[in-house]
Amino acid sequence: MSQSYINVIGAGLAGSEAAYQIAKRGIPVKLYEMRGVKATPQHKTSNFAELVCSNSFRGDSLTNAVGLLKEEMRRLDSIIMRAGEAHRVPAGGAMAVDRVGYAEAVTAELENNPLIEVIRGEITEIPNDAITVIATGPLTSDALAEKIHALNGGEGFYFYDAAAPIIDKSTINMDKVYLKSRYDKGEAAYLNCPMTKEEFLAFHEALTTAEEAPLNSFEKEKYFEGCMPIEVMAKRGIKTMLYGPMKPVGLEYPDDYKGPRDGDYKTPYAVVQLRQDNAAGSLYNMVGFQTHLKWGEQKRVFQMIPGLENAEFVRYGVMHRNSYMDSPNLLKQTFQSRANENLFFAGQMTGVEGYVESAASGLVAGINAARLFKGEEAIIFPETTAIGSLPHYVTHTDSKHFQPMNVNFGIIKELEGKRIRDKKERYEAIAERSLKDLEAFLNS
């Protein structure tokens, strides 16, 4: 086995972060990426760390678990966080990025790093020539997926997720929508398409009866809740969407609103939110409207939304299969394979769900691969931190019921002592403890 470099397979968010962290520690990296030679069903470019679903890194507040995770990653010099900050677009209290500018920045930095050799091509075998980080993502090629599944006795898990449509802003009827963030948090960053009860019921009927694109007959539908197709959500009940992406709470009509409304109500019956998708502000995505409807049906149904009667869809929603591993049985908390300590895994394939979480797992795997290379012991981040709670969750949960997981305060170790009843105060206390513990851990 070579002790002159480390392999990183896959240049998505996790692989890009892992490669950066390894090279930062003075170790040569061979970074393999098949895009540019072979396409995936979902990616649009050959850029590293491409965002294929939303352009949002979600909430930025420390009272939000993903906001805490991002702050921890900033303190660990995350390339994904740094590039994201440099290419932010308005999103109220959330962190959203210009997906093209951000991905190009990550790609350029890694390609120009003298310690990183970028190799474009498909890897079909698990390498055994050097310490290796596999971060090929939920869209892992079939050939390599077979080898990874063999580690689990041939048992593979999978689920479907979907991407939301993107709209040309110039085709939105601005007379029927209004600019506002929920509860007026941060700047008014979302375009809101309000619906009356009558409009919502007609929309719900059209959505639940629209024709979906076919699935392969051998693949069972198994959705991750965080990226569920809107039509699947709608079929769960007439009001399900009203507690999800079409929730109207905190999105009151502006004083000068002259469109239709239900009586004297100050809040619409339902709201579809559109979020800026690029730095120029010319594209908007439909928040929470991941879908697997046929493209013609998407146009017909979504043009029923007030303000979108003549909307031009620059990208229709699509759905794809996402594979993930039996991490509780296959991985250590360091993201090392239980069967081979020279093999690391990172990203959504490990069962962490979300852009930020994927990058965080790559950060941990990259640090530990570098430590192993140098003959040092792999580290386990404190379970009191967000970045420590994720690897603990995916490697310690019940394998029989293992599902992909976003970071949340429920998986971070509880505070000691008397429970703080106020949720905001409790989350603030957890965040304060997490950052203190991370600092102490890094200085130990």
UniProtKB/Swiss-Prot annotation:
Keywords from the UniProt entry: Cytoplasm, FAD, Flavoprotein, Methyltransferase, NAD, NADP, Transferase, tRNA processing
Residues that bind FAD: 10-15
GO cellular component: cytosol
InterPro entries: FAD/NAD-bd_sf (IPR036188), MnmG-rel (IPR002218), MnmG-rel_CS (IPR020595), MnmG_N (IPR040131), TrmFO (IPR004417)
Alphabetical GO biological process terms: tRNA methylation; tRNA wobble uridine modification
Top-level EC class: transferase
GO MF annotations in UniProt: flavin adenine dinucleotide binding; tRNA (uracil(54)-C5)-methyltransferase activity, 5,10-methylenetetrahydrofolate-dependent
UniProt cofactor(s): FAD
EC number: 2.1.1.74
Any one Pfam family match given in the protein's UniProt record, by short name: GIDA
Catalysed reactions, semicolon-separated: uridine(54) in tRNA + (6R)-5,10-methylene-5,6,7,8-tetrahydrofolate + NADH + H(+) = 5-methyluridine(54) in tRNA + (6S)-5,6,7,8-tetrahydrofolate + NAD(+); uridine(54) in tRNA + (6R)-5,10-methylene-5,6,7,8-tetrahydrofolate + NADPH + H(+) = 5-methyluridine(54) in tRNA + (6S)-5,6,7,8-tetrahydrofolate + NADP(+)
Main location: cytoplasm
Statement: the UniProt record of this protein carries the keyword Coiled coil: no
Subcellular location: Cytoplasm
Keyword Membrane: no
Function: Catalyzes the folate-dependent formation of 5-methyl-uridine at position 54 (M-5-U54) in all tRNAs.
Family statement drawn from the similarity comment of this UniProt entry: Belongs to the MnmG family. TrmFO subfamily.
Protein name: Methylenetetrahydrofolate--tRNA-(uracil-5-)-methyltransferase TrmFO
Gene source species: Streptococcus uberis (strain ATCC BAA-854 / 0140J)
Chain's gene name: trmFO
